[in-house]
């Protein structure tokens, strides 16, 4: 029979109607001569009651069997306010078995105790859990909001190629061998960067796309080898115009999904300020704990750890926690410092005028008073500090700062703090390649402040780029593009690309800019990460239908896998044993 309703649809107004529902058996409960079945489908749960004279209909039925039931809607005596159908139940007339199920490797419940490996191996069962299905529904809603907002502003959705050209800049490419063109490879896109820029050269005014991207990099909880991003570009636009557009969309997402109305413009924090105060270019500003430079306080110190910091051009930096941290908490924070290549984490505790801690006995009276004034200490505090090169000590204290917030629950999980990080360095030093490389990509316009000497003053060169940050996570990045051939040539030379390499890898791209290009700017943000944060998921894998594990393996189908020799032979490829 045809399904008349879903399992989340019926209520008290449907009493006495004959209905047909279809779904999975969630639970079977016998109470005397009566049996109750919780029937589940994608939409919800409805209770089915099987009377004494109908017990033969449920012989051999088990959880996760798929059935069709027909019966009459009746009012429940014992109501369940936790579900929309909790006022009614179905008095069964007939049950039809659609399909049986083997015993599942775990119970289909939200809070089931099962390893992630098992969940990923049986992802199709894991996806039956309401928690994971809700994540997929929210993801679909966010995608819908994005499309509506961009289309309302006259953006055109254009699909760009998945098979492209490998370039030496950026992360490792996933390569795809070509059978028809022997010994050649396509590269799966790390982003549609070059294609979307060419769309602007082609005369498109506003472009957007929800697109799958691929990066062959080390994985963690918020990374996957394939991921989805919102990609956009605008002709004749400044950085501010792009930021305004993205703000509008992200605020709409929060309003419709979380009911949060961001009325104020997002703050814009320069990169160097973010590093100085928070030790990170993606600061979590839900809590204070700002990093302070303490060089002046310890200018003439007798503390052995700090005594030669000036000669070695090092910085003494620290944070102040308005609590007395325990020995166990300090051990955890010291381990965090060690993960950032610092052997220890100095500390000093203050309580009602008394000092203690690893450096307390060596503090002079002047240093004590200066620390109290610097951190505005009242009754009690723990100061965490160390010495090192400015960038490294800032990075370490940024990690310690976040760990303190985690230990002391300083960050409200339902508080969302969005901000822009601007004025990024144009370059970053690559230890692996022993040269400066483009921090974002070699097509990002230098900031007007750096336009005259960006190829010679690399350490101070600033890019016209920007990141959107939420609660310590980078949501996305964008920038103004280089459209002047002279500036582009200077940029290529600055990152060590010779003419032959430029022509080989980018000739097809830069040639387009010889034919009249508008100034343009764009942005892209990771949809997977946005959904992860909106749902408070611990891992990005919980918001992707069929994810890979931390080793890039699909536990369900065992991809990547070996292929037959004849397949490799067709591609002129041999494997190295």
Swiss-Prot record:
Keywords tagged on the record: Aminoacyl-tRNA synthetase, ATP-binding, Cytoplasm, Ligase, Nucleotide-binding, Protein biosynthesis
Pfam families linked to this entry: GAD (PF02938), tRNA-synt_2 (PF00152), tRNA_anti-codon (PF01336)
Classification via SUPFAM superfamilies: Class II aaRS and biotin synthetases, GAD domain-like, Nucleic acid-binding proteins
Catalytic activity: tRNA(Asp) + L-aspartate + ATP = L-aspartyl-tRNA(Asp) + AMP + diphosphate
GO biological process, one term: aspartyl-tRNA aminoacylation
Chief localisation class: cytoplasm
Enzyme class, broadest EC rank: ligase
Annotated localization: Cytoplasm
Residues holding ATP: 215-217, 224, 474, 526-529
EC number in record: 6.1.1.12
Residues covered by region (Aspartate): 193-196
Record text on subunit structure and interactions: Homodimer.
Function: Catalyzes the attachment of L-aspartate to tRNA(Asp) in a two-step reaction: L-aspartate is first activated by ATP to form Asp-AMP and then transferred to the acceptor end of tRNA(Asp).
Family as reported in the entry's similarity comment: Belongs to the class-II aminoacyl-tRNA synthetase family. Type 1 subfamily.
Protein name: Aspartate--tRNA ligase
Organism annotation: Mesoplasma florum (strain ATCC 33453 / NBRC 100688 / NCTC 11704 / L1) (Acholeplasma florum)
